[in-house]
């Protein structure tokens, strides 16, 4: 899940963590397999998935780009950057589906905290609810009241949310003091 956010680094004093993120988005498909997990990004279909993968020792990376691809570095910069402070990669798009294990529902505060770990580094976060039918009150409250209050300058937007999720998010945003 952290790969999909960007700004992933083990040495923040010397490295921004944007390199692998920008490279991934230049390719049409990317697949990384390691320690029994496989993460796949498909820019054409606009989705990412995590599945069980090979348990072979080591890490494998497969990257494909079509000769007719329209991915450019400028397009990647434009999509994941705001005009605030002329920063590059200060906007994250996070597929909510990556926070789930198997087909579990997203109900708890701990699931929301896992999804939003390290997102305070950005100016803008777009949460993609594609494929998510239901979230719990606590999950929504942790993101749209607790996290938002801790980071008031961070803009959080939602896409691909169904009516249930839109109503729940709206309720938390408008009546946050009534939720706990």
What are these regions (language model features)?
Residues 45, 66, 75-77, 162:
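Regulatory and interdomain segments flanking nucleotide-handling catalytic cores
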């Amino acid at each position: 899940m952290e790969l999909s956010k960007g700004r992933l680094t083990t040495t923040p004093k010397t490295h921004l963590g944007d390199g692998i993120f920008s490279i991934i988005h230049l390719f049409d498909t990317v697949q990384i397999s390691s320690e029994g997990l496989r993460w796949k990004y498909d820019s054409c279909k606009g989705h990412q998935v995590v599945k069980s993968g090979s348990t072979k020792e080591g890490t494998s990376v497969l990257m494909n780009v079509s000769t007719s691809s329209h991915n450019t570095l400028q397009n990647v910069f434009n999509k994941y950057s705001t005009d605030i402070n002329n920063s590059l990669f200060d906007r994250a798009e996070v597929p909510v589906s990556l926070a789930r294990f198997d087909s579990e529902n997203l109900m708890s505060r701990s699931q929301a905290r896992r999804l939003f770990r390290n997102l305070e580094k950005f100016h803008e976060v777009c949460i993609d609810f594609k494929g998510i039918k239901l979230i719990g009150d606590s999950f929504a409250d942790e993101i749209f009241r607790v996290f938002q209050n801790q980071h008031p300058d961070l803009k959080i937007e939602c896409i691909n949310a169904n009516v249930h999720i839109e109503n729940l998010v709206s309720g938390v945003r408008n009546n946050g003091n009534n939720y706990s």
